[in-house]
Amino acid sequence: MTDPSLFSAKPQTSTVWWKVACLFTAVGLIWRIGRYLFDFPIWGDEIMVALNFPDKSYTELLGHLDHCQVAPPLWLWAEKFLYETAGPSSLALRFIPLIAGCLALVLHAWFAWTLMPGRAAAMAIALLAVAIWPVSMSTLTKPYSTDLLVALAMLLPAHAALTHTRPVWAMALLAIISPVALLASFPAMFIAGSTLLVLLPAAWKSAPSTRWTYLALVGTTAIGAWASIQIGQNQLASPTGTAEIDTQQGMVDYWSHGFPPADPLRWIPWFLGALTGQIMAYPVGAANGGSTLTVLMAILGVVTWMRSGSKSVLALLLLPLVLNFMAALVHRYPFGASCRLAQFLAPSVCLLAGLGLDACLSRTSRWPAVLVSLVLLAVGGGGLARDWMWPYRDPVFVWMRGTMDDAVQAAGNDSVVVNHRRESMECVFAWRWLHAPAKVGWNGSLPQGERSHDRVWVFTQEGCPMPPGPTALEFLKSQDPRWRETRFLNFQYPPPNPQKQPPIHVEMVLLERD
């Protein structure tokens, strides 16, 4: 079952490129760890999944999720465990994504160096190390960096099974990894399917032990896929609070640009736009053709690989993209909608684009390669410097964090009445009040079990639904007419572009009894 790598031996100059590869790996790790330590303000998409941790048990996380969220069960369990043991801080919630992102970069470096000649491997490592999407996903409380790690954890033994003279052990390892991977990453389904398809022809021509091991791999993968699909379907069936819309419909609507248009005549423009958009943003790129250069490098890499490398390994790298496209055709998983949804494709994109970039560089002069390396280093160093100077995703989340810091500090250990349900208000505000030292009541009610008060704060977000009936002040005055408003705190966010984002107004009123 031996299937040779792209080159069986590396030239002497690989010593230099090994050092370059190590340098890029170090830069990528430093950027990821630095961005994590800069502690960007937590934002809505992170909190919407985190809001499932306080009230749901580990078993309940296998069922419906609130706030239109979908996430693999093992990732949810790991995050809930950290939430319970390390607390609700953003650094605690982002720790697992950071570890996954750093490990993924190291595994990618190992994989690239195993597959390709020195300079091509260094280019492939650099593309992943300094790309903004893998870096940002490593510091986000979402499972995307885990998708990347799981993809590499499956590709490495799959490659070993294709290239080693005794593939049984690599295939057996893959049989153990596969069901775990499918429960840790939903897109791992594409990697698992590609692996089974690529290994089938060679396994069936091998010794009986290899065939039986392959059948075991099929069995464990089927079990993991079945469990993953069942849990995913439970989550997709979750109600969203909007009549006749569940999470699945919400996801389809939100990621509609990741599915082919109804008119077949528009399929080719849609496909080309998706393929040259964010899905290929390594090291940089954008939607609407913004990653065309990376696509061209990847195509050149495919051509180069077909001339010199293993066709089976090339199929292993390309099939996940094909399966992703097929899933988009039946509206099961978006294609090209966002780079964060396609982190499982990052190894394939970076390896092929790195090989294509290497093919473009001169074989006689070192200066073009040096210049490209310096540009890529500047991308990584510039990204780290930008994160240091502007440590936030969007200014509104800086304002939200500052507003809630002031509000929570003002409330102290007093009682707080939040005039809204948790699910109807800005989730950043809900998260902070949920973990504030103050005693908090929701939907206009006094904190449960707290009926003896002298000071009560009332928190209101303008534009959010409020409960019918008397206000907190009216209720308290009905119990004791000495209650009155004594202090007002107003927080206003004027957005830079009011047409895209409405202003946010929050009010805190202190009620005291004379």
Model-identified regions with their sequence ranges:
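Membrane-proximal helix-loop-helix interfaces that form the catalytic/acceptor-binding platform
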Residues: 13, 17-513
